[in-house]
Amino acid sequence: MIAPIVIMQSCGSKSPLSKLGIGKKNSKGGGKEIGMDGVRDGEIIATSRKGYKQTAPYGMVLIPSGSLMMGQADEDVMSARISMNKRVTIVPFYMDDTEVTNHEYRQFVNSMTTDSVSVLGEEFIMSTLYPDTAVWSKDFTYHNGDQMTEYYFSSPAFDMYPVVGISWDAAVYFCKWRTKLFNDFRSQHTMFKSPRYRLPSEAEWEWAARGGKEGAKYPWGNPYVANGKGCFLANFKPYRGNYRADGYPYTAPSNAFNPNDYGLYNMAGNVAEWCQDAYAESYMPVTWDLNPVYNDENEPRKIIKGGSWKDVAYFLETGTRTYEFRNERRSYIGFRCVMDRLGSVPGRE
C-alpha cells in the first residue's frame, strides 16, 4: 500500500508547489525552461502558466480568509432559535466597497434595453429588471413619496445613492451581466477568464461586516451606535418618528459614514442587502462549517442583512438575520457583489 503524501504549508515558508518544479529549469533539457504545454522530452512537467495574476476589480476590496462565530454577538433569548451561534471558516473573496449605486445599475438596464431586448423582451426587462420606482409610495401607508418616486433613480442628484426597488432575481441578473461585461473585455485582450460576480453568502456577508473583529456587534466594532461626540455611525432610525437624526431622512450616498476595517461602507444601515442564501429558521445544523451557504430552490424567501434607513438599531447588528421574498422589491433593500479569490492569498505565499 502506498502511503498518501500530504503537502503542508507553514507561515512564512515557501510554497509547497515549488517542490514540484514549478517555475524551475529542466535539468534534462540543457537548462531551457519548460514549455507552456507542460510537456518536455516526452514527460509531463509540473508547471504553471505565466501571465495570470488576480487583482481586486475596480470598486472591490479583498476580504481575507478567517474564522468567525456566526450569529448574535450579544445574548438574545428571543432570537436564539433563529440566530444560533456556530463557528465557521470563510475563504478569501473580493467584495464591493459600497452598495451598487443607481448610476451603476442604470448602465445595466440601459445595456439590457439596447443589447438584449430581442432575447429577453421589453416587458421582462421593464417588469423584472428595471427598478420599481413606486416602492417609495407603496411601502408605506399615507406617505408622500412622490419626490423619491419621480427622481430617485433618474436624477443625477442620486447617482451615488444605492439602487433600491430591486428583487433578488434582478440582483442575480445584474451579477451575470457584470460578469459577461468583464470577461468579454478580458477575452478581447487575451487575458485569463475571471471568476464570476455573484451575491455574497450570509456567512461571507457577516464575516466582511465585522471587519476582522471577533464578536463585533456592529461593523465599527463597539456596541454603540454613536461616537463620543454623539454623532450616529450609520443611517438608520435612532428614535421614534425621527429619521433625520443621523443626517439623512431616507437613504444616504453609498460611501457615507466611515468604512469598517476592511474598507466597506454602509454594512450597517442605509439599505439592507440581498444575500445568496435561502431563508430557514434553523439552517446552521445542516450547513457545513467551511464556506457555508444554504441553497433551496423551493424556498422563495431570501436572506437580507444589515438593516436600513427605516430600521431600529437591532437590525443593524452583524448577527441579525431576516428575509424578504425573492420577487419583492422594496425602498429599503439593495445589494452588493462579491467575487471569489482564486489560489494563494497575498502575504501567505
Question: Where do the model's predicted regions map?
Answer:
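Short, P/G- and charge-enriched loop/turn segments at secondary-structure junctions
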Residues: 48-50, 80-84, 321-326
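Bacterial N-terminal signal peptides
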Residues: 1-6
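Short proline/glycine-enriched turn/loop segments at secondary-structure junctions
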Residues: 293-296, 322-329
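Short, structured beta-strand segments at or near domain termini in extracellular proteins/domains
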Residues: 331-347
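Functional-site microenvironments in short loops/helix caps that host divalent-cation chemistry
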Residues: 26-40, 63, 69, 74, ...
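C-terminal motif of bacterial Sec signal peptides marking the signal peptidase cleavage site
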Residues: 9-10
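N-terminal pre-domain segments of enzymes
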Residues: 15-53
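A short glycine-rich, aromatic-capped structural motif
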Residues: 52-148, 162-170, 269
